[in-house]
Amino acid sequence: MSIANDNPNARPVVVLGPTACGKTRLAVALARAFAGEVVSADSRQVFRGMDIGTGKDLQDYGDTPYHLIDIVDPGAPFSLFDYLGAMQRTLDDLDAREKRPIIAGGSGLYLDAILRGYRLVEAPVDPLLRERLKHHDQERLNALLASLRPLHNTTDTQDRERTLRAIEIAYAELNEDSPSVQISIDPVVIGLHCDNDRLRARIRERLETRLDEGLIEEVESLRAEGLSWRQLDELGLEYRYVALYLQEQLNRNDMMQKLASAIYLFARQQVKWFRRMERQGVAIHWLEADDAPLDNALALLRR
C-alpha cells in the first residue's frame, strides 16, 4: 500500500487485544480522528446474522465506514485465503480513496497472517489427487507430505483428512500458476492490555449485556434459518453454549458460568498468541484498556 510507504504519518493502524477490552470503540475513534475506515480482523464477524454473539457492536460505528463484516452467510466456507483476498481488495480500495486503514480484531491467525505477511495459495480440493492417494496408508501419506513440505505441522500427520489436505496445499504451492495472496503493510500496532481480574469482570458484564440484547434469540434465529446443532457448536463460545442451553443440556445459570469461563480462557489464549507474535518480530505498543487508551493512542500516532 502506498500510504504505508509514501506518508509515514498515515501508516495503517492495527488495534488488537483480547476479547472485551474495547478494540472496536478505540478503532472507531481513531478512524474518526484520522479520516480512516475500520477493517475487521475477526474470523466470526464476517458472517451475517451473527451480530450479538460475535460482538460486532455496530451501534458503535455511527457513520464510520467499516469493512469485512457481514460478507458471508453463516455455514458457508470461508478460509484464511478468502479472508486475505478480501483484505487485500479492501486495502487497495482504501488506498485509492486515500483513507487510512484502522484494522481491528482479536483473531490471532488473521492478525498474524496480516502482520507477518503469510503467503497463501488457492488450494481447492483435488478429487483426482485424492483418487490416486486413496489406497495409501497413513505412513505412506506422511512420507509424501514430508517430501513435499519438510517443515509441515506435526498435526497434519495425525489424521488422514488433515494429511490429504496438507498434501493438496503443498502441491498447489509448488504450482507457479496457483493464485496467491500476501498482505504487505507497515502498520503501527496498538495492543490493549487488561489485567486478569478486570478482564474477567469485563467478560461477565458484556455477556450479561449480550443476553439482555437477545443473544439467545439470535441463536434461535440461526437455527431457524437452517444451521445444525453441529454447525452452531463449530462456531464456538456463545453459539456453542447457547445451543447446549436450547437443547436443554445446560440450565441458564450453568450456561452463563461455563460460557463466561470459556470466554476468559479464550481471551488468555489470544494474549498468548499476541506475545508469540512479539517474539517473532511484531512490534506491539501496549496500552492499558482502562487508562485513557484513546488519548494514549493519539499521542503515540502523532509522534
UniProtKB/Swiss-Prot annotation:
Substrate binds at T19, A20, C21, G22, K23, T24. It holds the Pfam family IPPT. Gene3D superfamilies: P-loop containing nucleotide triphosphate hydrolases (3.40.50.300). Residues 42-45 are annotated as: Interaction with substrate tRNA. The gene is miaA1. GO terms for molecular function: ATP binding; tRNA dimethylallyltransferase activity. It catalyses: adenosine(37) in tRNA + dimethylallyl diphosphate = N(6)-dimethylallyladenosine(37) in tRNA + diphosphate. Its cofactor is Mg(2+). The keyword Transferase applies. ATP binds at G17, P18, T19, A20, C21, G22, K23, T24. GO terms for biological process: tRNA modification. It comes from Hahella chejuensis (strain KCTC 2396). It is an enzyme of class 2 (transferase). InterPro entries: Dimethylallyltransferase (IPR039657), IPT (IPR018022), P-loop_NTPase (IPR027417). Monomer. The record marks S107 as: Interaction with substrate tRNA. This is tRNA dimethylallyltransferase 1. Catalyzes the transfer of a dimethylallyl group onto the adenine at position 37 in tRNAs that read codons beginning with uridine, leading to the formation of N6-(dimethylallyl)adenosine (i(6)A). The keyword Glycoprotein does not apply. Keywords: ATP-binding, Magnesium, Nucleotide-binding, Transferase, tRNA processing. It comes from the Bacteria. Its EC number is 2.5.1.75. Belongs to the IPP transferase family.
